[in-house]
Regions:
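N-terminal beta-alpha lobe that positions the nucleotide/phosphoryl donor
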Residues: 43, 56-59, 104
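A conserved beta-strand/loop capping segment in the N-terminal third of enzymes
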Residues: 49-87, 221-222
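Charge-dense, low-complexity intrinsically disordered segments
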Residues: 42-45, 49, 92-96, 168
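Glycine-rich active-site loop/strand segments that organize a redox cofactor
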Residues: 21-51
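Gly-rich Lys/Arg/Thr-decorated short loops/hinges at beta-loop-alpha junctions or inter-strand turns
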Residues: 15-17, 42, 81-89, 157-161
C-alpha cells in the first residue's frame, strides 16, 4: 500500500458525521428514494441497491473489528440524521467517525505480515506493456524512484479537493491517479461531477478548511447566502 503522506493523513480521517445503514426491510424503499433524489436521479441504480443492501453486513463487520459507534441508553446503536435522509440512519462516533473507523482498520492492517504500508511514497506512473498494467513507478520523499511490479493495481486516490484554494481536503489529495489513468487511456466516468462539501468554518488563513459536519444540516440547520437567502 502506497500513500503520499502519513497513512493517517487521508480524507477518510476527516469525516465527521457518520456512516449510513439500512434500518430494516421496511426502510429500503425510502432509503433508495432518498439516495436517488439526492443524486437528481442520475445515480446508477445497481450501485445504489448494492450500497443499501450491503450496509448491514459492513456495519456488522466494523463492529466485529471493534469500531466504537455511539449507543443509546438501552445499549442499542444510536442514530442521527444527515441531509437528504428522511429518517435517522447515521451511525457515529462523537464527531470523529471517520477517524474512529479508519484508525481502527489501519491499526489492524499494520498487524498483517502480508501487508506493507509505504508512507511518503508517490505513484508517478503505471508500468504498462501491451495495454496491460504490471505495477507502478513510485517516488519517495528524496526523489528516489522505484518500480513496483504487481499482478493487480488498485487506484484508491480520493478526489481532487487539494487543487482548490478553499477545500476541506488535504492538499496532497490532488487527482494524481486520475491524471495517470487518463495518460494510459483507462476508462473514466463522470469527471465533470465534483462533490463539494458545502459547510466549512470560514477563515482568511490559507490551507485546508475545517469541515462542519453534514449532520448539522441533517438535524435541521439551514444554509443561507450572504444576502440571507436560502
Amino acid at each position: 500500500m502506497l500513500t503520499k503522506q502519513g497513512a493517517d493523513l487521508s480524507d477518510s480521517f476527516l469525516a465527521q458525521g457518520g456512516i449510513c445503514m439500512l434500518r430494516g426491510v421496511d426502510d429500503y424503499e425510502d432509503y433508495f428514494e432518498d439516495t436517488m433524489r439526492a443524486g437528481h436521479y442520475e445515480n446508477n441504480k445497481r450501485a445504489v441497491n448494492l450500497m443499501i443492501r450491503s450496509s448491514n453486513d459492513i456495519i456488522r463487520d466494523l463492529l466485529w473489528r471493534n469500531v466504537d459507534f455511539v449507543r443509546a441508553e438501552d445499549g442499542e446503536l444510536a442514530f442521527t440524521r444527515e441531509g437528504a435522509h428522511s429518517r435517522p440512519r447515521i451511525l457515529f462516533h462523537e464527531d470523529i467517525t471517520g477517524k474512529e473507523i479508519t484508525q481502527t482498520l489501519l491499526d489492524q492492517v499494520k498487524t498483517k505480515e502480508n501487508i506493507e504500508i509505504c508512507e511518503y511514497m508517490t505513484m508517478v506512473d503505471i508500468i504498462s506493456k501491451d495495454n496491460i498494467c504490471g505495477g507502478v513507478i513510485a517516488m519517495d520523499a528524496k526523489n528516489n524512484v522505484y518500480p513496483i511490479r504487481s499482478q493487480f493495481v488498485v487506484l484508491a486516490c480520493g478526489g481532487i479537493g487539494g487543487l482548490f484554494q478553499n477545500s476541506t481536503n488535504y492538499p496532497h489529495i490532488a487527482g494524481d491517479g486520475l491524471g495517470i489513468a487518463m495518460k494510459h487511456q483507462v476508462k473514466l466516468e463522470h469527471l465533470d461531477y465534483i462533490q463539494i462539501h458545502p459547510t466549512t468554518l470560514f477563515s482568511h488563513k490559507p490551507g485546508r478548511r475545517f469541515l462542519i459536519s453534514e449532520s448539522v444540516r441533517g438535524e435541521g440547520a439551514l444554509l443561507y447566502d450572504k444576502n440571507g437567502q436560502r
